[in-house]
Amino acid sequence: MTTTDSGTGKLVRTQGVTAPLGFRAAGIAAGIKASGKPDLALVFNEGPEYAAAGVFTRNKVKAAPVLWSQQVLTSRRLRAVILNSGGANACTGPEGFQDTHRTAEELARALSNWGTETGAGEIAVCSTGLIGDRLPMDKLIPAVTEIVHEMGGGLSGGTDAAHAIMTTDTVPKEAAFHHRDKWNVGGMAKGAGMLAPSLATMLVVLTTDAAVTAEQLDTALRKATRLTFDRLDVDGSCSTNDTVLLLANGASEVTPSQEELEAAVFAVCDDLAAQLMADAEGVTKRVRVTVTGAANEDEAVTAARAIARDSLVKTALFGSDPNWGRVLAAVGIAPITLDPDRISVSFNGNPVCVNGVGAPGARQVDLSGADIDVLVELNVGDGEAMIRTTDLSHGYVEENSAYSS
């Protein structure tokens, strides 16, 4: 699927942060990665407005670039975002924060020399990769000037940037929504491991040419994040570097309603979250766990997350085993209201458990396909929620045992 039409616009997966008007981007190899692959990305807002919003990891151990970006976003204004892969710059002490500050200052200087007067306080910095090592500033600083001159105004610059933020990702992740009223939202994401509730181990940059305020962006982003990235839970691990940013420049001169803005931002975030799930480390099954009939939405999220994180459930799904007993066992230890005799479970629309007991033919349900929908009906209220997750495969174990963090 590369294009999806709706009544209000079109969602496209072959475009990203440069799909909206007035944004440039680039991705280059700075030499941070030993492989020589692209590892530095830049997203630049040409204006005329520079409204911005962001959400960050809830991990108490925050990387230097997270602390920096949280600080600069208090102004609710950003001209640029610079992102590196190949090093998280987390748990690196005061020196790591100084490296982040220096990166922003060097980019501000390069942009100003390029012809756009920019201050370091208008630049967000994001990093991803191994925790505990400082970045090779002798390679990074010269590359900051180089990437400014590599910025393109076309779609290819956005794709280059999406490639440059990849770590264990196997494919770049982009999405754009083109509203029928001639305004747009674009985005790129990275993340393949440590996918968990506080946004997943992800860097996400979203852009829009809508004429909206930073307050409107903040509301739209928080609503979208709560229903998409916050409900992506592959392995229960929460990163030190999670960052989602949304920039707006008003270049379209169109002011959508708040509802229209929220719908478009959600559409892009939801598609990016689906792409993150599909490219999770070692994934062989894309799984959606939906809980209905919970006492309230919060309890539905708790129940769905308990199932999504359960190793026995995940290994059963890896083996295409319709083991509904493991689902009941997982939900049974969740701190929620439930009646065991009212729980029903379905796999891909096939009932396997009704009112707490097995349904006829439950063991014969075919789960050999790549997509599995798990529906759990608690029947104690009207709360519902969906969590995206994956199976637990040999590939996941092998990849994470070989990848230092």
From Swiss-Prot:
Predominant localisation class: cytoplasm
A Pfam family per the record: ArgJ
SUPFAM superfamilies per the UniProt record, alphabetical: DmpA/ArgJ-like (SSF56266)
Keyword Translocase: no
CDD domains, A to Z: OAT
Positions bearing the site annotation: Cleavage: 200-201
Keyword Transmembrane found: no
Site feature: Involved in the stabilization of negative charge on the oxyanion by the formation of the oxyanion hole: 128-129
Any single biological process term in GO: L-arginine biosynthetic process
GO CC list: cytoplasm
Pathway info: Amino-acid biosynthesis; L-arginine biosynthesis; L-ornithine and N-acetyl-L-glutamate from L-glutamate and N(2)-acetyl-L-ornithine (cyclic): step 1/1; Amino-acid biosynthesis; L-arginine biosynthesis; N(2)-acetyl-L-ornithine from L-glutamate: step 1/4
Reactions catalysed: N(2)-acetyl-L-ornithine + L-glutamate = N-acetyl-L-glutamate + L-ornithine; L-glutamate + acetyl-CoA = N-acetyl-L-glutamate + CoA + H(+)
Annotated coiled-coil segments of the chain: none
NCBIfam families noted in UniProt: ArgJ, PRK05388.1
Similarity comment text for this entry: Belongs to the ArgJ family.
Record function comment: Catalyzes two activities which are involved in the cyclic version of arginine biosynthesis: the synthesis of N-acetylglutamate from glutamate and acetyl-CoA as the acetyl donor, and of ornithine by transacetylation between N(2)-acetylornithine and glutamate.
Subunit organization: Heterotetramer of two alpha and two beta chains.
HAMAP family on file: ArgJ
Protein name, UniProt field: Arginine biosynthesis bifunctional protein ArgJ
